[in-house]
Amino acid sequence: MSEKLDEVDSKSLDEINGSIKVPKNAGFWKTLMAYSGPGFLIAVGYMDPGNWITSIAGGAQFRYTLLSVILLSSLIAMLLQAMSARLGIVTGKDLAQLTRERTSKRVGFLLWIVAELAIMATDIAEIIGSGIALELLFHIPLIIGILITAADVLILLLLMKLGFRKIEAIVATLVAVILIVFAYEVLLSDPSISGIIKGYVPSVEILGNNSMLYLSLGIVGATVMPHDLYLGSSISQTREVDRKDRENVAQAIRFSTIDSNMQLFLAFIVNSLLLILGAALFYGTDSSLGRFVDLFNALSNNQIVGAIASPVLSMLFAVALLASGQSSTITGTLSGQIIMEGFIRLRVPLWVQRLVTRVLSVAPVLIFAIYYHGDEAKIENLLTFSQVFLSVALPFAVIPLVIYTSSKKLMGEFANRAWVKWCAWTATIVLILLNIYLILQTLGLIK
């Protein structure tokens, strides 16, 4: 079925690999329940604090037009994450392990450094989002909030001891909080249903408007997260699979793909709700919505959002922001462990790995916070730069993924079919070109 892989390596996330039993000869729904869970962890990366400002600003500036961009981005994400899960299930290796085995030492070292920096960039967005949420909810000084957020490594260490199913349940709960909050706020905002439906139809207007195109690139560039591709290839292996049994492998691929697509559909709904909220409440206003604090204040200002304005809406927004940040903590930690163990085969205690990654991520945020005396606007600029770097890092994960899943020598009969390969390479090239354009425009090198 696939070529023999290096057996001296330990399994990906060894402590939870194959730890969840799947009932044999069970019905569709019972089997789906057994495979459900990893998709929630994947979906978190598609609704983290780094995506919020772009989606809401897109609605505020261009109403519902950019909903089609969110739809396209979500379809690309579903394709790549399905390939990531397939890779892990068929080979029994994660993307980091395979990349190390199949590249030279120099290339492997470069890819490892980029992957580690991507984890740090993801952490920065989570730290800033959580720190600001704590300030908004409890009036904790931002610097103190950042330090509290940094200490959440202890939370994850406790969760890992409870078992992977418990982690999945906690993340699912946090995702549900985010979904419910924004669904409620959108219902109150009374959006245009016809405008929403029309917004999902791609418009050539986007290509002819520089501001609209720039925001579109931001949405696409922030959608597929590099660390999620490493994560997906690993946590797809948490279910017990007999790789000598073709039917068992095919079943695992099928249900893991369904789980991933279901949860990414939820992420698509959340991102759509963010844009719809921006369109329904802020379109046509002169308010600045480039910061979390601006959005928080606007939701309780009846001169901006009208009669529905209330402190409750603002508080719910901050609660959702905190839930988004904390759920990212879990996935960031697991991704960091996968990357470190896979690329350099360095098995260190989880608390050491997490602490090192966390300190490196907190340091620039803390330095910014102290230097600018807790000025949220300046600190959120760092969040923007972290998202730009994730765009830079994306091809370094996507290209190996497409190559490996298209290899019949590696994947056997489960290699990408011709149409999947064509779609994957097309999506990859589009993502790379869009990200290059976004980076150049962000740096002011093109107008």
From Swiss-Prot:
Statement: the UniProt record of this protein carries the keyword Cytoplasm: no
Annotated membrane topology: Multi-pass membrane protein
GO biological process, one term: iron ion transmembrane transport
InterPro entries (alphabetical): NRAMP_fam
One Pfam family recorded for the sequence: Nramp
Keyword ATP-binding assigned: no
Cellular component aspect of the GO annotation: plasma membrane
GO molecular function: cadmium ion transmembrane transporter activity; manganese ion transmembrane transporter activity; metal ion binding; symporter activity
Record localization: Cell membrane
Cleavable signal peptide: none
PANTHER family: NATURAL RESISTANCE-ASSOCIATED MACROPHAGE PROTEIN 2 (PTHR11706:SF33), SOLUTE CARRIER PROTEIN FAMILY 11 MEMBER (PTHR11706)
Record family assignment: Belongs to the NRAMP family.
Role, per record: H(+)-stimulated, divalent metal cation uptake system.
Entry protein name: Divalent metal cation transporter MntH
Source organism: Pediococcus pentosaceus (strain ATCC 25745 / CCUG 21536 / LMG 10740 / 183-1w)
